Amino acid sequence: RQMCIRDRPDTNGEDWLFMDLETLKRDPDALCGKSTADFCALFAPVEAADSTDSSVQAETLRKGWAARGVTFSDGGCSMISVVFHDRFSETENTLFIGHVGVLLPAGDDGLYFVEKVAFQEPYRLTKFESRAALKSYLMAKYDTGWGQDTTPPFLMENDVLMDGEAAQ
């Protein structure tokens, strides 16, 4: 699926994404001709629902992206996002993407996942036999919460909650 960001009102997010935006200022070609407003529309936090249910939060994130003009269409690859829920205070309750990668078909025998795990590291290509295997890999790395009153990390495939083999 391909991502499209339509014209939209102010998307903000600069205060959350300042390190990314500084990097993009130094290397504007990394946006492939897109604007930092498009980057912020996708990666700026979205106001979270008052819930710890990942399906409720996934729908909240989808609606937040839609309000910013972020949509996905069918194509050969998918964006996989690890989404975190933070409740900093009574007035700060947000969802944000903590990690992202691209999922590609590997013919009849699995899936390729491309990710950048750290600025100083090269991109990594890993082959998985299934979405369930990819989910296990990502959750082992990022599901590190201990009894918080927030939603545990969850995965989105484009704008759909990824539940093992369910998202496609």
Give the role of each language-model region.
Residues F84-R87, L104, V117:
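Short, flexible loop/turn elements at secondary-structure junctions
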Residues L111-Q120, F128-Q168:
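Low-complexity, Gly/Ser/Thr/Pro-rich intrinsically disordered linker/tail segments
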